[in-house]
């Protein structure tokens, strides 16, 4: 065995990918980075604000401070604070002497509305987790495994052809094998490509992904509506007139009907309202961008794997409308690019292929690795002429 042949064998052996069977499921990312960011913000931010509201309530005591008359006892003053917080309504008297009541309940419901918002924003996450993730994880495991196996099969094919070249005394045998490998499919059943074609006709994952983002937009719109309808109406009101002629003070003739109370938690209410509107306004373009990514193919990823035999979705123009499950899977393949060991190898080979002087004879990884192993990528002219003379 020659030194060059040994070096080529070592080089091809090093190019083979290790078997990572069983360890990939834990490392798979089943949420896109932007989706994960949106999840943490839409769910975590309301919970953070809810904690702020509860902390302010516990630290400052009563969220309102009523200006009770000086002749009130401690018991009566405590009753006024409790009664006004329970009713939390602003009373004004019109010219006819009738009371107009304006409810200030958004102040009281603030922590619970934030909790409801966090729960609502978590529903799209649960939808994706239980409806799409089981199917997506199996798809990714199979496709990643098959892509790496296809790369390994290509390298083993080059090893086999190198052995044929070294063991055969007739160079025509090697070139016949090489031409046959170029013209025919390397697999009797191109399972991966047919599986990807099947996913191109499926719309389960993409429908779930669209529904997830549509629900996020719907709940965000509901948040805007809630803030505009209820919070804006009481946003600047720091005082209110409370009707106290009830319960303990109902029969007290010397007690006024209305007293003034001040909302001590108004600043927290305003901070929560403004920050919620600002954060969700920022997130809307992110959600829309996530949806627009479904309108285009990741041809950069596909073009790299065009170097594999029997993987020609691009060259055969098999890509149609991008709104299907295959496009969603490609987005997650890009997010799990660290799990695709073959991608880094093929990326390097693709760059090197573009710099070689014999591009017309190098189409797949088999052609390039054959060339790197020290073999001619095409039949030498003297052998071609010899074959032509024999047929003549």
Curated annotation (Swiss-Prot):
The keyword Membrane applies. PROSITE patterns: PANNEXIN. Keywords: Cell membrane, Endoplasmic reticulum, Glycoprotein, Ion channel, Ion transport, Membrane, Transmembrane, Transmembrane helix, Transport. GO terms for cellular component: endoplasmic reticulum membrane; gap junction; plasma membrane. It holds the Pfam family Innexin. It is a multi-pass membrane protein. It is found in: Cell membrane; Endoplasmic reticulum membrane. GO terms for molecular function: calcium channel activity; gap junction hemi-channel activity; structural molecule activity. It catalyses: Ca(2+)(in) = Ca(2+)(out); ATP(in) = ATP(out). Expressed in skin, cartilage, heart, lung, liver, spleen, thymus and kidney. Not expressed in brain. Expressed in calvarial cells. The keyword RNA-binding does not apply. N-glycosylation may play a role in cell surface targeting. Residues 61-113, 237-267 are extracellular. GO terms for biological process: cell-cell signaling; osteoblast differentiation; positive regulation of interleukin-1 production. Glycans are attached at residue 71. Residues 1-39, 135-215, 289-392 are cytoplasmic. The chain crosses the membrane at residues 40-60, 114-134, 216-236, 268-288. Homoheptameric. Regulator of osteoblast differentiation by functionning as a Ca(2+) channel in the endoplasmic reticulum which regulates calmodulin (CaM) pathways. Allows ATP release into the extracellular space and activation or purinergic receptors. Belongs to the pannexin family. This is Pannexin-3. The lineage of its organism: Eukaryota, Metazoa, Chordata, Craniata, Vertebrata.
